[in-house]
Amino acid sequence: MFHFFLKYHFFLFISMAPRYYLTLSQVCSQVWCNKYTIAFVLLAVKVYTFSLILRSTLDHLMDLVDTINVSLDQFASTATNFPAQLTQLTNKLIAEQLQQLKSNFKLSLLLLVSVIRALIGFYMEIFLGTFTCLLDAAAQASVNFALDSAQATLKCLNTTIVSVTSEVESGLESISSFIENSINTVSSLFTNGKKPSVTSINLSLGKLRNLQIPGSVTNELDSFRLNLDEFDNLKNSTINLLTAPLTHFDKNVSGSDLFGPIDSSKMVVANYGPSAAKNVTFDLTEVKNSIVDFKNDAAKIASIMIIVLASLSVIAMIALVFVERRNFVKRDIFVISVREKSSPLAIGNALETYQNRTIYYMAKLKVNPRYYWICNYLTSKYAMVVIIIGLVGVISFTLQYRLLLSVKNKLKNLIDTVSSPEQTKQLQASLSQYTAQTNNYIEAQSKALNQNLLGWYMKASTNVNDTLTDILHQINSTIHTVTGNTALSKPFEVVVYCVIGRKIVAVTKGITWLNEHLVIDLPQLPVDLFKDVTEAAPLRYGKQLETQMVKATNSLEHMLFIELYVALGFVGIWVIFIVMGIIFMFFPKKRTIGSPKLLTKTEKEEYIFPLSSFNTSSSVYSTLNDRPIS
């Protein structure tokens, strides 16, 4: 309470002193240095310096783009000349490899043909030769037995026939004499001694004396035995027919120019030179122009922010002029109110209303007076310094971060432009000529091998296949010729099909499968051979640019967030003031005071205290304990 008495005494004192307060014009001469204007000016300076840092970063990125452009041009030049240099180095190696491949393939084919030819003779000997041998043995044994039996039987039969014929003829002669005598006797009885008309009766075998079984039967058996040699002829002719195409193929392969030496200088790929490739240069001018546009946009945004902040500072100065003018009006009102008030508490409240604008406006708005104290506590000069610094820091962060984001989002699009520029596709198209020419040459070699080499094999295998098909017909025809319509014909044909025919059918199927699948397919270069190479360098440089960009933006972001954290720290202190104010408001410190000391005569005169006698007992002042203590 003594504090309020001092304030009251002070105002009384200055009322009798000469004027030393500033007039309105004098205050307005310094209003341009108000804290709001200074804050806005500092924000403008901060935005300007940050824009300079950002533009310097963009200049560094633009220099990096120039370096990347030069590196990409060197890469394009090297990549364009690489196929020609590679051709000169590898043509001889390719020719040697193709020559070795052809030689090895030729040797393999000759060995394969020799093996097939030997296997054909081996299988024909196994199947047809074995069957012929068995058939010949069986037939020879049967014919020899039949021939020997027929000769013995014919000899015996002919001897028996001759003996029987002689005996029959002798008996017939006796019978003939008897009959003739009988006829003569009877005839003389009936003819009166005349001579009979039948002179003689001759009973004989006549030509039957020479009756014998002809020897042609044994001749036919000999012919059957000799015809068995047809199976040997069939076997030999079959082997010759089957191996004839292979022999022809062997001669063609051995004498072909296809397997001759390859001249690497005459290879089609050797004609590929630097002039064959399209000259490709990387031009990142568009990227540089984009960065320049970003710089201009950043400068434009920074200029707008600075202009806005400068305008706000001017507005703050103008507003404060009106505020100061109102303060003088409020001062007059305060002086009048102080004259009318005698209570120190009322004088103190009037003084705070004059000094604190927040309470002044709350009073004008007729806000509940119970909230005046907490507003006064939170808007004191110490609390306002904290919250203003915090808010200025937050606003500064917002403006600078907005400026950084405007550039950062646009820079991300440049990474794709550098990582996969249009020139990469042109370079790939240029280098694909080398791949196409090389693949055409390899394909031509494959066609030559398939036509000139495997064409002979196809023809030979087709002839072998056709010959195998005719074998069964020849075997059946030979069996029919040998056995004729005998009972051995059908069994022999069945045995031949089971022993030989089924194998021949399997062989023909195998040859047909080989004809369909035997194709020389030399490996070719991948179509995208240079794709990874041409894309790797732009991707690497794009990654380098991205790394530098991210590093720069992250550094700026880190700096801005440090400012934000500091500003939020000041705001946090002001929040602590809020908590402390709530504690003070709802938990006031209670204390008990004693009776006030009596004023001396001099003090009474200074404070214009009434000097009349009055009760100064402590009971009079005991009611002060119930008054609010400031």
UniProtKB/Swiss-Prot annotation:
It comes from the Eukaryota. It is a multi-pass membrane protein. It is found in: Cell membrane. Belongs to the PRM1 family. The gene is PRM1. Residues 1-37, 130-302, 398-566 are extracellular. Residues 59-108, 324-376, 588-630 are cytoplasmic. The chain crosses the membrane at residues 38-58, 109-129, 303-323, 377-397, 567-587. The keyword Glycoprotein applies. Glycans are attached at N158, N202, N236, N252, N279, N465, N476. One of its GO terms (biological process) is plasma membrane fusion involved in cytogamy. Keywords: Cell membrane, Conjugation, Glycoprotein, Membrane, Transmembrane, Transmembrane helix. This is Plasma membrane fusion protein PRM1. The lineage of its organism: Eukaryota, Fungi, Dikarya, Ascomycota, Saccharomycotina. GO terms for cellular component: mating projection tip; plasma membrane. The keyword Membrane applies. Involved in cell fusion during mating by stabilizing the plasma membrane fusion event. InterPro entries: PRM1.
